[in-house]
A protein has these predicted regions:
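Short helix-to-loop capping/linker segments positioned immediately adjacent to catalytic or ligand/cofactor-binding
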Residues: 45-50, 108-111, 127-132, 154-161
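Beta-strand secondary-structure signal
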Residues: 74, 96, 124, 172-174
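Short beta-strand segments
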Residues: 41-79, 97, 107-113
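Short, basic/aromatic recognition patches
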Residues: 16-45
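C-terminal edge-of-domain segments
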Residues: 1-20, 131-202
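Short, structured beta-strand-loop surface elements
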Residues: 79-139
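Short gly/pro-enriched beta-turn/loop segments at secondary-structure junctions
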Residues: 41, 92, 116, 165-168
Length: 202
């Protein structure tokens, strides 16, 4: 099999730390920017791997800041499933987690030069299935507080019972490193548009 084009450059890229960016000019301005993206994102995608097979699961989540360290991501899924198996059988399982927001399309005179505004974060760390009931309730309470902030536990809904906890898997991702990447163009860029464009085929 012939070597791929740019083989030496690809080999160097493969040896870089996971959170390193090729385009440093588009890196997040600071860690506060990354934390804000993790707090505000509606959905995140968790990547796990088992026996060489990658697996992605998009899910609701909550990000919890830490006094020391980068913080924790909390998620939950069904009690038995691929995500639960990949994390439990590999614990502490190497995982990564991503959130992404798309902005405007930025047209150009050549197809190669088209671009897009974006803001995204990739976090790398260790995934664990949470077994302690108090910790499970803590993580689930953070998720409820994020997505149902206008409702009050005990008043508007019943918090998870022991029976409920037996039916779900709660996961904790301890973030070890992260990177953020963003591109934003001036408001007056000619022809910039939101996708899908009005009149575009559907």
């Amino acid at each position: 099999m012939a070597a791929p084009r740019h083989a030496s450059a690809l080999a160097r890229a493969a040896r870089q730390p996971a959170a390193d960016l090729r385009r440093r000019d588009r890196g997040a301005p600071d860690d506060a920017w990354i934390r804000e993206r993790l707090r505000a994102a509606a959905v995140g995608t968790l990547a796990t791997v088992r026996d060489g097979q990658p697996f992605l699961n998009a899910n609701l989540f909550a990000y919890e800041e830490a006094v020391d360290g980068l913080g924790t991501i909390w998620l939950h899924t069904a009690h038995v499933g691929r995500t639960a198996a990949n994390v439990a059988l590999g614990a502490p399982a190497p995982v990564c987690f991503s959130v992404f927001e798309m902005g405007r399309m930025l047209p150009a005179s050549r197809a190669l030069e088209f671009s897009v505004e974006y803001a995204g974060v990739v976090a790398f760390g260790s995934g664990l299935v949470v077994e302690d009931a108090a910790a499970q309730r803590h993580g689930l309470a953070l998720i409820m507080a994020k997505y149902a902030a206008h409702l009050q536990p005990e008043t508007d809904y019943e918090p998870p019972t022991d029976a409920d906890l037996a039916r779900t898997s709660v996961f904790r991702v301890e973030i070890e490193s992260w990177s953020g990447k963003t591109k934003a163009a001036p408001d007056d860029v000619p022809g910039a548009y939101r996708w899908p464009a009005t009149g575009a085929p559907t």
